[in-house]
Amino acid sequence: MKSDIEIAQDTKELPITEIAKKVDLQPDEIELYGNDKAKISWKGINRIKQGKKLGKLILVTSISPTPAGEGKSTITIGLGDAISNQLHKNTLIALREPSMGPVFGLKGGATGGGYAQIITMEDINLHFTGDMHALTSAIDTLAALVDNYIYQDNSLELDPNRILLKRGIDVNDRTLRKITIGQGSRFNGIEHEASFAITVANELMAILCLATDIDDLKKRIGNMLVGFSVKDEPVYVKDLGFEGAIAALLSTALKPNLVQTLEHTPAIVHGGPFANIAHGANSVIATNTALHLSDYVLTEAGFGADLGGQKFMDFVSNHLDKRPDAVVVVATVRALKYQAEETTDHLDEENIPALEKGFENLKRHMENMAHYGVPVIVLINKFASDTEQELSKLKELVKADGFECEVVSYHDEGSKGGIKAAEKVVELTNKASDFTSVYEPTDSVEEKISKIAHNIYHAKDIEYSDKAKDQLAEIKKMGKDNLPVIMAKTQYSFTDKKSILGAPKDFTLHVKNLALKNGAGFIVVATGSILDMPGLPKYPAALDIDVDNNGKISGLF
């Protein structure tokens, strides 16, 4: 079988103007970026809000993944193609933009795989329409303005040692996690420690993905907490007057991007916060726009259902025009064997006992999603190494727990690799649902953390570090303890330790620190060892990437 990039490069895309027509976007409602991608204009966004009935919303999430991932984006794209091209229903796919750092690191890109991809994958995985570069510029401009304020005036007596904002770069670079700036004479600024986070982990990314228009964007930027004064008073961006300039840098990036799949299904790709350290969903503008343009919208939540899935249900959906109508949980045979602590070099070997043991992980994710009161189906992403005995056993286990289940092979067959699955998903969206959140908006921070830990992770106890206790007291002092919580946790385990696999229970969850993201409107609760600046592996994907003299790129995946 051809590589992902070979398949993508061999596909003839339609002009993006033709894709826009499929969802009733007019020529003057898109802004072209070449022949194959466009931004949807404010004129288009505002026009489609009027009158049309909202489409059905299908959320795709997954079990706890292996380090290689389980093909959630591939399933989202393939399922969208199947609903569109096999069932002939008006469909739109809404996905996150890939971060460039992991493309050159371990994970690779995020445009699907095989015959279920969004294109052009080189553009989307690298520079695309420039959104990530605009975000990086905005992040670092804000940091520079804050440092200049301290150097030039500092009438609010902002303490340079208590600045909470981080600089940003869309590259995996562990050397930038902690640095000292302003070294040398005072001519170079005020010396103090600083740090970088990868662009998608910055609060401005979360703000971009939650803002509903430019006024909301500007308001959220103004509400960002910069740090504290020497008198222990909070200082916000609006206190310094920088929100207008930063919003101007992001005004174009706020418009969603329109592309297509290999099978020419329209797709909106916009925003990309990580799910293990942020809320892990594409922009609210993208999903709401898709809901107004089509009858069926497929979107995904990052990592497993305990991370992106939980955050989508309890947080993201509060900002959307509607709740999900159905949830798809993606599972793979190999990941379940991994959850049974089978070593990675043996995952391709048939092992029914390991599959049965690892099923406990999938069982918990299914039941967690079902507790939200929305219909749930499991789609098994078929790998070449899966045996018929393993696939049959997994379907049997899922159905015995009361859930629908289908095996799909969108990667190898495109939309034809799961027509029955598409029919079942569409059928599920018509079932009645009774949405229930894990926690109430009026719950305290501690209550919200406790309910997620007990009901989703199945932890017994929660242990707060002294630092976390101090930060919680500080948040309460500022009157911000009514905000939603976003858990930052390893994606590989229900616990805060990535080595504890399966479906553990009655463990202690360790809360290391809390961070107020006032502009985004949530509190990040960090558990275990979570990094917002990844490093590169010993053998980075960059070593396999090349470009020929005609500009044709190879090695991306």
From Swiss-Prot:
Q: Where does ATP bind?
A: T66, P67, A68, G69, E70, G71, K72, S73
* Gene3D superfamilies attached to this UniProt entry: Domain 2, N(10)-formyltetrahydrofolate synthetase (3.30.1510.10), Formyltetrahydrofolate synthetase, domain 3 (3.10.410.10), P-loop containing nucleotide triphosphate hydrolases (3.40.50.300)
Q: Indicate whether Nucleotide-binding appears among the record's keywords.
A: yes
Pathway terms, separated by semicolons? One-carbon metabolism; tetrahydrofolate interconversion
Q: Which domain of life is it from?
A: Bacteria
Enzyme Commission number, as recorded = 6.3.4.3
Biological process (GO) annotations held by this record are:
tetrahydrofolate interconversion
Query: What's the catalysed reaction?
Result: (6S)-5,6,7,8-tetrahydrofolate + formate + ATP = (6R)-10-formyltetrahydrofolate + ADP + phosphate
Against Pfam families, the record matches this protein to: FTHFS
Tagged with keyword Membrane: no
* Assigned keywords, A-Z: ATP-binding, Ligase, Nucleotide-binding, One-carbon metabolism
Question: One GO molecular-function annotation for this sequence?
Answer: ATP binding
Q: Which InterPro entries match?
A: Formate_THF_ligase, Formate_THF_ligase_CS, P-loop_NTPase
Into which family does the record put it? Belongs to the formate--tetrahydrofolate ligase family.
Q: What HAMAP family would the database entry show?
A: FTHFS
User: What is the name of this protein?
Assistant: Formate--tetrahydrofolate ligase
Species: Lactobacillus johnsonii (strain CNCM I-12250 / La1 / NCC 533)
* Lineage of the organism: Bacteria, Bacillati, Bacillota, Bacilli, Lactobacillales
